[in-house]
Amino acid sequence: MKNINPTQTAAWQALQKHFDEMKDVTIADLFAKDGDRFSKFSATFGDQMLVDYSKNRITEETLAKLQDLAKECDLAGAIKSMFSGEKINRTENRAVLHVALRNRSNTPILVDGKDVMPEVNAVLEKMKTFSEAIISGEWKGYTGKAITDVVNIGIGGSDLGPYMVTEALRPYKNHLNMHFVSNVDGTHIAEVLKKVNPETTLFLVASKTFTTQETMTNAHSARDWFLKAAGDEKHVAKHFAALSTNAKAVGEFGIDTANMFEFWDWVGGRYSLWSAIGLSIVLSIGFDNFVELLSGAHAMDKHFSTTPAEKNLPVLLALIGIWYNNFFGAETEAILPYDQYMHRFAAYFQQGNMESNGKYVDRNGNVVDYQTGPIIWGEPGTNGQHAFYQLIHQGTKMVPCDFIAPAITHNPLSDHHQKLLSNFFAQTEALAFGKSREVVEQEYRDQGKDPATLDYVVPFKVFEGNRPTNSILLREITPFSLGALIALYEHKIFTQGVILNIFTFDQWGVELGKQLANRILPELKDGKEISSHDSSTNGLINRYKAWRG
């Protein structure tokens, strides 16, 4: 993978000139000039997904210049490097192969000359056997009762992905009740334990090293709670499984290493739901549906790795994102799913994007002088419309938005879905085209009112429009289509990281806070006043000690 400063390319300079020509062009102008704009600026993924990017401040020339940037930054070479198992995570000397976890073609993928697919398939087979025993009731707890509840204990990628997917695919779930514990705040584990019975609960401890502070603190609290009821430590093996590679620590905890599900250092945490970390997904929706999830992602992997950049959906979305982030100065992107089951999707890609591309040092080790990853946020529609859409419509900040919705709902109650989708379509239209002063005044006339007497309020009812959006319409949210959608966003993030010349697959930014927390923890054990930090940190610690007594 090459290290190219994007701002030094000819394509970047051409884009800067083009931006000067485009900055005052409106989306309304673009549609007025081209009645065929939708067909030119939309694409489908099989019969599963339609991506409409026509309501953006772009022309065919814009996209051509952005494609030139991708070529100059050798995006095609970077894609080949990732899929071939090259160690593109150079700061940790690791390959990046979440694509191998869902490689349904079983084509060999090599790391250090060794095909990883046999090991991937062996773990999948183990997940299948284990999950079938739990779901069928064949697996019994220490009193002979079948498992009814599963508690996944993890944090970051070991929590966000499985939680998001099990919620998104709730229509496919079986009888098992799923719970997720991540926060080291004791309230999280305490509230979950109130809902479950030690005789019928299975805990999944998701930590590659089996040393993650938050996860192991929660796991030990769960173990203590369980043993208060079960008594004998030998029963731990019937109620705990590990998603880890540290067999020694897993065994010492009391977990049978036969129920330890491994993954590899070429699986990044925020890309790990496809691995053993996805065991909670398998237990929730069954192995066959999990395979469908993998198959959908694999289909998008094939699209990304083989489709020319001009028609490549992750590449197109990535380039449009760079256009706003690096030329228009937009600092955020909103992800707005119009489906309640998808309520954790934005939070999942908040980590997926911000932990991946929130970097200020480039691949050469130099501090960048251009913008890197955007701030990602969002909530499901229509809730967001009654919360933050005001700022998107009439605020002073540009917020490019992705609107996501299924054409077919899993819950066809009355006309709920038509009302939901009418809002989905209306919002992108309103954001693009707005509402002029003339229209506001005409509305007053139609109501029999004189606009002149209401002049003081007219400006507040004007919508400038020209707010960019992408619309992603799925036929239906299924395991397959969700897998494809997740992979679409993963590859968008990778593409942007390649072009921005940063390392997308490390996350050193999480380390400093952890180091300092480990230093501070012993200082909180007693009541002595602290003076070892800056005055602010000392003051906070000392007030905490005074108040806790």
UniProtKB/Swiss-Prot annotation:
InterPro entries documented for this protein: G6P_Isomerase, G6P_Isomerase_C, Phosphoglucose_isomerase_CS, SIS_dom_sf, SIS_PGI_1, SIS_PGI_2
Superkingdom assignment: Bacteria
GO BP annotations, alphabetical order: gluconeogenesis; glucose 6-phosphate metabolic process; glycolytic process
A GO molecular-function annotation: monosaccharide binding
Predominant location: cytoplasm
Pathway membership: Carbohydrate biosynthesis; gluconeogenesis; Carbohydrate degradation; glycolysis; D-glyceraldehyde 3-phosphate and glycerone phosphate from D-glucose: step 2/4
Entry-linked PROSITE patterns: P_GLUCOSE_ISOMERASE_1, P_GLUCOSE_ISOMERASE_2, P_GLUCOSE_ISOMERASE_3
Active-site residues per Swiss-Prot or TrEMBL entry: 355, 386, 514
Entry-linked NCBIfam families: PRK00179.1
Protein name: Glucose-6-phosphate isomerase
Species: Escherichia coli (strain SE11)
Gene name per UniProt: pgi
